[in-house]
């Protein structure tokens, strides 16, 4: 669940100091109402000065009223607690729980894309997350309750195949786009059980792609509706980045681009030196993003440091140095 909480404080026209921003964010923290859910993130987006919206850095400016929109990401408590319990049962500690788009955006989106406006579509196994970035930050999020695993189930049901074989067919022979040659390429499907030896059958690649396309039409239609609901239209709505395991389907970017009428690319983890090729695909983007998140210093109104305790972050400090610093602090 994603929503925007707005808060405003009186300044009396004086120059905005860091203490004023801290006071505003503290007021925002006190105004949060999760409605029984667990807050994962409460990040300030853009500020307002006397009603003028879209100010990214108000420090040093003058205003009678200073406001901020806080993007709040919540989730039902029970699933989050179950995930936490599973990880701790494996004798691992949990530092924090991060919403997938927050981490994935760090791994696959460039700073310019996040500034100008971009939609990030994560096609996972059972859920597709659609998020919107603008002004350098996450400003909207919604989820669609199906994903790439539904394509696998459709293939298994349509051709009487086992799920593991259906997944293999999707990965090796599947495509989001069709060609005339697909009618001549044959795919052999093994029997459902070992007792049915000799009863394998064959289908054309065109038949497989037809089943995949039917599910994709539904999925991309839901993605398009979600983008419109988030306000992803006009000049800001020109760039879409696909990621997640479902984005690895052959021809996926071309198909989505044709349906949405927007520029579409597949997002892969970037900037991590030494990442194996097998782990550099879109299916590993969230894991890579968690590394970035752990090495960064994200702003959250629930954890506000007094001005004299704030650490000035340097853009010149590399990811490796940040990780080493974090390890030294922990041990």
Predicted regions and their residues:
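Feature representing long, continuous alpha-helical segments
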Residues: 153, 206, 210, 214-221, ...
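Phosphate/pyrophosphate-binding loops at sites that engage ATP/ADP/AMP, CoA/4′-phosphopantetheine
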Residues: 220, 224-239
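A short acidic Gly-Thr/Ser loop motif
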Residues: 120-127, 133-136, 145-149, 244-249
């Amino acid at each position: 669940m994603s929503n925007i909480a707005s808060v405003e404080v009186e300044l009396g026209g004086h120059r905005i100091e860091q203490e004023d921003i801290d006071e505003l964010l503290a007021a925002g923290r006190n105004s949060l109402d999760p409605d029984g859910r667990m807050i994962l993130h409460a990040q300030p987006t853009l500020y307002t000065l006397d009603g003028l919206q879209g100010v990214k850095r108000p420090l040093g400016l003058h205003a009678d009223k200073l406001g901020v929109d806080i993007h709040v990401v919540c989730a039902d408590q029970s699933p989050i607690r179950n995930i936490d319990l599973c990880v701790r049962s494996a004798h691992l500690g949990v530092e924090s729980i991060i919403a997938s788009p927050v981490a994935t955006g760090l791994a696959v989106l460039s700073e310019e894309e996040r500034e100008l406006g971009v939609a990030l579509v994560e096609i996972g196994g059972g859920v597709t997350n659609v998020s919107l970035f603008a002004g350098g930050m996450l400003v909207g999020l919604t989820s669609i309750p199906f994903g790439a695993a539904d394509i696998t189930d459709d293939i298994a049901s349509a051709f009487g195949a086992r799920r593991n074989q259906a997944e293999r067919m999707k990965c090796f022979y599947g495509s989001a786009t069709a060609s005339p040659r697909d009618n001549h390429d044959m795919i052999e499907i093994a029997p459902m059980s070992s007792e049915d030896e000799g009863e394998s059958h064959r289908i054309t690649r065109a038949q497989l792609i037809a089943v995949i396309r039917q599910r994709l039409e539904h999925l991309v239609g839901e993605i398009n509706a979600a983008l419109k609901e988030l306000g992803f239209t006009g000049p800001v709505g020109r760039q879409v980045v696909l990621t997640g395991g479902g984005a690895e389907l052959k021809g996926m970017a071309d198909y989505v681009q044709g349906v949405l009428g927007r520029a579409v690319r597949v997002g892969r983890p970037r900037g991590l030196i030494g990442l194996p090729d097998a782990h550099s695909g879109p299916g590993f983007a969230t894991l890579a993003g968690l590394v970035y998140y752990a090495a960064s210093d994200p702003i959250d109104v629930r954890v506000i440091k007094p001005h004299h305790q704030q650490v000035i972050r340097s853009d010149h400090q590399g990811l490796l140095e940040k990780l080493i610093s974090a390890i030294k602090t922990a041990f």
